[in-house]
Amino acid sequence: MRQRTIERSVEVVGIGLHKGVPVTMRLEPLEENSGILFYRKDKNRYIELKPQNVVDTKMATVIGKDGVVISTIEHLMSAVYGYGIDNLLIILDNDEVPIMDGSAISYCMLLDEAGIMEQKSTKKVLRIKNEVEVRDGDKYVRLKPADTLSFDFTIHFDHPVIGKEHYHFEFSKKNFLEEIARARTFGFLHEVQYLRSIGLAQGGSLDNAIVLDEKKILNPDGLRFEDEFVRHKILDAIGDLSLLGMPVMGLYESFAGSHHLNHLLTVKLLEECSNYEIVEASTTTQEGYVIGAACAKE
């Protein structure tokens, strides 16, 4: 299986979730073996997509370098991962990725517009060899060895609409588009009100998030999936997993996970070389996920 980039440059204008200010985002092709690279045009600063550059995970996944940051990258990166893109330049003129509708589907449409192009170099895959786990009380995230990438997620909220939700997801581009990409971010009205009082969530609205009060969903059109909340948690995790810089072969299990735990898991995984091996992708399904590999450890 070969590395991929986009065929042509594309651009979109939206607003940032927290500051609520307009931001222009441009996606451009990159040559093979370049990886995913962000560029803050207003600060003339490049930031590589890697766990070492994560600077904040409280409300979103934020990367930064030398004091220059880019916030809320996870939904975009979930789409980039879903499309199997290895090399991409993401240019922004502000410090937030545009939130769009709060899911990944708008970014998927943007990538469809750009087109996907295979390159000459073989795609590298990170294969999990040893189980790695991070816990915070009863919350946990873990990666286990497996021959494909899949997610087994459970969330539990003390809310009559959400309660306990579980979803098992077998990763492929087709499944991503059908089951995960349209799942929106969500929040509670009292949290939104507090965030706005401290200058955050200025761009949040019912057009780009599911908002719940104490008893019900406030969005007039309701949910896109009965279990949209846990599906969005998987969307987030895919985006956070993209910071590893290559596709992953493993089972990702989570109970009440978060951006913070996702990040700690990627860091812990990379701490010990025995936890993983890097192989060349050799066999794929029609949808594009790896089901076999030729050993080529680096």
From Swiss-Prot:
Q: Which residues bind Zn(2+)?
A: H75, H232, D236
Please name the top-level EC class of this enzyme. hydrolase
Which coenzymes or cofactors are required? Zn(2+)
GO cellular component terms? membrane
Query: Which reaction(s) are listed as its catalytic activity?
Result: a UDP-3-O-[(3R)-3-hydroxyacyl]-N-acetyl-alpha-D-glucosamine + H2O = a UDP-3-O-[(3R)-3-hydroxyacyl]-alpha-D-glucosamine + acetate
Instruction: Give TM regions.
Output: none
- What is a biological process (GO) this protein takes part in? lipid A biosynthetic process
**Keywords carried by this UniProt record:** Hydrolase, Lipid A biosynthesis, Lipid biosynthesis, Lipid metabolism, Metal-binding, Zinc
List, from the UniProt record, the residues annotated as the active site of this protein: H259 (proton donor)
Q: Which domain of life is it from?
A: Bacteria
A single Gene Ontology MF term assigned here is: metal ion binding
Entry's Pfam families? LpxC
Q: What is its EC number?
A: 3.5.1.108
The annotated pathway is:
Glycolipid biosynthesis; lipid IV(A) biosynthesis; lipid IV(A) from (3R)-3-hydroxytetradecanoyl-[acyl-carrier-protein] and UDP-N-acetyl-alpha-D-glucosamine: step 2/6
Purpose of the protein: Catalyzes the hydrolysis of UDP-3-O-myristoyl-N-acetylglucosamine to form UDP-3-O-myristoylglucosamine and acetate, the committed step in lipid A biosynthesis.
State the similarity comment: Belongs to the LpxC family.
The protein's name: UDP-3-O-acyl-N-acetylglucosamine deacetylase
Whichever gene encodes this chain, its name is: lpxC
